[in-house]
Amino acid sequence: WTLSLLLGAVVGNEVCYERLGCFSDDSPWAGIVERPLKILPWSPEKVNTRFLLYTNENPDNFQEIVADPSTIQSSNFNTGRKTRFIIHGFIDKGEESWLSTMCQNMFKVESVNCICVDWKSGSRTAYSQASQNVRIVGAEVAYLVGVLQSSFDYSPSNVHIIGHSLGSHAAGEAGRRTNGAVGRITGLDPAEPCFQGTPELVRLDPSDAQFVDVIHTDIAPFIPNLGFGMSQTAGHLDFFPNGGKEMPGCQKNVLSQIVDIDGIWQGTRDFAACNHLRSYKYYTDSILNPDGFAGFSCASYSDFTANKCFPCSSEGCPQMGHYADRFPGRTKGVGQLFYLNTGDASNFARWRYRVDVTLSGKKVTGHVLVSLFGNKGNSRQYEIFQGTLKPDNTYSNEFDSDVEVGDLEKVKFIWYNNVINLTLPKVGASKITVERNDGSVFNFCSEETVREDVLLTLTAC
């Protein structure tokens, strides 16, 4: 009897394991519209969840620990530090470079136990099976958190679980099994198929931790667009960078992003659409850019792009990614929506500014550009307006700078004519007002006018 319990006794549609308890294929886990197949998760042995510990003392080479006090004791695990788990998704693996890179960025800003969770044995199978196997992964993480609590008096509130794709729902399962006592869960583009629209029991939801934040980067419907991420909210704070569908720098041709099947089985990271992978790249970048991912409270991305959501509210803007937990209103509601834009390449951080330009000089047709100069850096030129330029009229725009300029010291104005004008008209900016996302306002003035393609420098009024 004991042996059969250890091996996993299948009784009807339920399977039980000594450490992890029982798993059934009853509703809502299976046999519902979103997951019609009656499938049980694989055994813990077959899923083979592994815990790869990186710390500030061993940033480059992991120590493998198990949920046993002796291996934890003999490792560099430090009970005086926070612990952040990182759980990969479908077809991925815990040794993939993005997980250890995320840990290494953390070590640049904090002392932390960073545990990469490898479950490649359970993720490299049919998607419908992998989506059940995350229940085992979540149970294993919860079991380890329980051992830390019982053997080392380590509080679950010091635990942060970061999950990508299917890993987001494994994180949710781990949190559910600790009755929401885990301090924080971050969902990085939680997987849509088999999870969107299911009961909260099955998927990541705000009750799974004291604080849940989610980054959505691939919310186009799976059919027909092959969008892998959930569009529904799943946290206290839900961030939709670039609107959540098309990430800058990702090609729109879906087929070009799907590698050949042999590549998939070699464990390549690019098994899926570029958009889906952007979520963990944004998070990794956010660790080293504490204020470069401000999210703006907004009803929709179209409102955000129409400049209706600037500046931040009186309590500020939450930062998407690593520092989302610094936001004062982080748990005042669930499904709070935030929008922002990011860059398109490796440096994803952006700083949003609003600029108002009051013109002087002649009435002409053309476009106006402004560049910002501050104590932290200088921006490139950004277009504020294009069309008929009228003196004494004020033109406004918002833009996302790839440079944080800090406190503004001066601005430069330039204008271009759209048509050849033999009268060589002159245009100036009598006043330029720059507002940062924190509501700080800087005013600059000039009485000069300039011909087209000539820079005009404005200093503080």
Curated annotation (Swiss-Prot):
Its EC number is 3.1.1.3. Keywords: Calcium, Disulfide bond, Hydrolase, Lipid degradation, Lipid metabolism, Metal-binding, Secreted, Signal. The active site is at S165 (nucleophile), D189 (charge relay system), H276 (charge relay system). Disulfide bonds join C16-C22, C103-C114, C250-C274, C298-C309, C312-C317, C445-C461. GO terms for molecular function: all-trans-retinyl-palmitate hydrolase, all-trans-retinol forming activity; lipoprotein lipase activity; metal ion binding; phospholipase A1 activity; triacylglycerol lipase activity. Belongs to the AB hydrolase superfamily. Lipase family. Forms a 1:1 stoichiometric complex with (pro)colipase/CLPS. This is Pancreatic triacylglycerol lipase. It comes from Equus caballus (Horse). The gene is PNLIP.
